Amino acid sequence: LYMIPALMGMLLTLICGFLPALNVVSEKEVGTIEQINVTPVPKFTFILAKLLPYWITGFIVLTLCFLLAWLLYGITPVGHFIVIYFLAILFVFVMSGFGLVISNYSATMQQSMFVMFFFMLILMMMSGLFTPVSSMPEWAQVITYFNPLKYFMEGMRMVYLKGSSLLELLSEIGVLFLFALGFNTWAVISYRKNQ
């Protein structure tokens, strides 16, 4: 019961962070991104078009996870699905922005894969997925404050286990919003610089 909501967060991290980064870098390698850049399509529209399929896929996978958790384990959230999906929307924005930042600084797919894999390991190990944050050393607990996955997992567990409302999740929502704003702004700025 404690792990199921966290595993959903891990899947969203992989789908909405890892895959968009690889997609944009593959466009660079093939050379099609140069053709797209000379078209009158705004950069925001291009980035949105790249991310939208992964957002939709992420929400489909999240919905399937809810269904499987109910069918296989009989686990349903105590709180509302609307709260979970709201948290998921914020987290998807965070991870897709993070993936785009990595792709903007990567020249090849191998480079972006290694960098994303490195950060994914840190995000997962320092999020409280396997080890509760309270049982980590003090220096590790400090690092977790800069981990968006930690806030998403805490929010998911609070909704799943306690039935928390949006008002009770204001701190998690606020931090995820700041991460989303920061990463996506950085992604747009760094994309323009590279062009």
Q: Where does each model-flagged region fall?
A:
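Helix-to-coil boundary motifs at intracellular loop junctions of multi-pass secondary transporters
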Residues: E27-K28, N104-Y105, V159
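Short cytosolic juxtamembrane segments of multi-pass membrane proteins
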Residues: V188-Q195
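Alpha-helical transmembrane segments and their short interhelical loops
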Residues: K43, I47-M124, L167-I173, F177, ...
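Long, hydrophobic alpha-helical segments
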Residues: I4-P20
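Transmembrane alpha-helix boundary and packing residues in multipass membrane permease domains
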Residues: F18-L22, F66, W70, L100, ...
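Transmembrane helix boundary and interhelical loop/hinge segments in multi-pass membrane proteins
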Residues: G17-T39, Q195
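Short helix-loop-helix connector
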Residues: N37, V41, S106, T131, ...
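Membrane-interfacial helix-loop-helix junctions in multi-pass membrane proteins
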Residues: T76, S127-G182
